[in-house]
């Protein structure tokens, strides 16, 4: 069994996510407390009892999703379960880098908090939207975006073959949706997001994030050194990056990649293909929702796909991995 961990990004959040896991595992409660001590945010209260509008704000969403994933990782660590490879969608790439030993846990939490604040506060003025287009070829969606006359819109996430997320000005996204329907798309769905993420419109946020990245240490060696990390071993785990769907290497300038990450399209379709080529046969999505699990299943029906987002499927996954 060759396992990959997948970490979700923004849009997977919902009030109450992970509450039953929090209530039943001390390891999870300890992680929420750890994050609260670092960020001075009551992540548990915000996630379990808060207002949906507040949770959906980027500065809150990102740290809440990260915390849930980290809490579950602590439980998997207790059971000596770890991945050979990890990856995530957008925000989830940061979770993967923390888990895999590239970024220290404390510094990673601080960085994600700052990233969420920058992406919330430095969105240019205007009405922005994102939408998932299903059932069209990549080049057709790109052609549609280029043909829109009512404003800025561009592909932001290449999720899997047959699904692309577009991002841009609200009117332009709406026009692109209509053009996609005329072109025969199977479905077009607007997403729960509050900005033109993974587009050049977040250039100011990218520049400010770069200043924060300069303050942290990136571990490019094969061994995790001194990081309080949620893994049984101290050996580095490969991370597949969003920007091109390839593994990080020792030669990569990770800080520069993460600076570009915020304004560049996510190539999760290529990420999936890379993990399959590397022999992954068991994928475990860790965190709210099951979006990434769906991407894997639509790409390859032969591999085992599990997701952990509540107490029931956590226990099912633990039982399965004991085989």
Give, region by region, the residue ranges found by the protein language model:
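FabD-like malonyl-/acyl-CoA
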Residues: 1-141, 222, 282-297, 303-311
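Short, solvent-exposed amphipathic alpha-helical segments in soluble enzyme
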Residues: 22-23, 147-148, 181-183, 298-301, ...
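Glycine-rich phosphate/pyrophosphate-binding beta-alpha loops
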Residues: 61-63, 196, 265
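Non-catalytic positions within long, well-ordered alpha-helices that form the structural scaffold/packing
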Residues: 77, 181, 276-277
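Cys-dependent protein tyrosine phosphatase-like superfamily
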Residues: 2-4, 234-237, 241, 247, ...
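Alpha/beta catalytic cores of group-transfer enzymes, especially the acyltransferase/condensing modules
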Residues: 10-12, 38-39, 100-226, 230-260
């Amino acid at each position: 069994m060759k396992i990959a961990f997948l970490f979700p990004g923004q849009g997977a959040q919902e009030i109450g996510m992970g509450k039953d896991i929090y209530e039943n595992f001390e390891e999870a409660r300890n992680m929420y407390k750890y994050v609260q001590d670092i960020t001075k945010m009551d992540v548990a209260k915000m996630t379990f009892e808060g207002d949906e509008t507040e949770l959906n704000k980027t500065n809150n969403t990102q740290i809440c999703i990260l915390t849930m994933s980290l809490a579950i990782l602590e439980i998997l660590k207790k059971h000596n379960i770890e991945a050979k490879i990890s990856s995530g969608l957008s925000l989830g790439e940061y979770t993967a880098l923390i888990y895999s030993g590239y970024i220290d846990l404390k510094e990673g939490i601080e960085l994600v908090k700052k990233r969420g604040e920058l992406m919330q506060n430095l969105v240019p003025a205007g009405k922005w939207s994102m939408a998932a287009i299903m059932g069209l070829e990549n080049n057709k969606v790109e052609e549609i975006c280029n043909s829109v006359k009512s404003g800025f819109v561009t592909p932001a996430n290449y999720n899997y073959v047959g699904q692309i997320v577009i991002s841009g000005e609200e009117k332009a996204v709406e026009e692109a949706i209509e053009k996609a329907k005329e072109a025969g798309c199977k479905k077009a769905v607007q997403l729960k997001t509050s900005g033109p993420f993974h587009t050049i419109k977040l250039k100011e946020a990218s520049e400010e994030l770069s200043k924060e990245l300069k303050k942290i240490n990136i571990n490019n060696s094969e061994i995790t050194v001194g990081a309080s990390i949620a893994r049984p071993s101290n050996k580095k785990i490969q991370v597949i990056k969003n920007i091109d769907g390839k593994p990080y290497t020792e030669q990569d300038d990770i800080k520069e990649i993460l600076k570009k990450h915020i304004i560049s399209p996510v190539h999760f379709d290529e990420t999936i293909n890379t993990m399959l080529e590397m022999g992954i046969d068991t994928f475990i999505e860790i965190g709210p929702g099951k979006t990434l699990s769906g991407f894997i299943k639509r790409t390859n029906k032969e591999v085992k796909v599990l997701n952990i987002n509540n107490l029931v499927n956590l226990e099912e996954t633990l039982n399965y991995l004991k085989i």
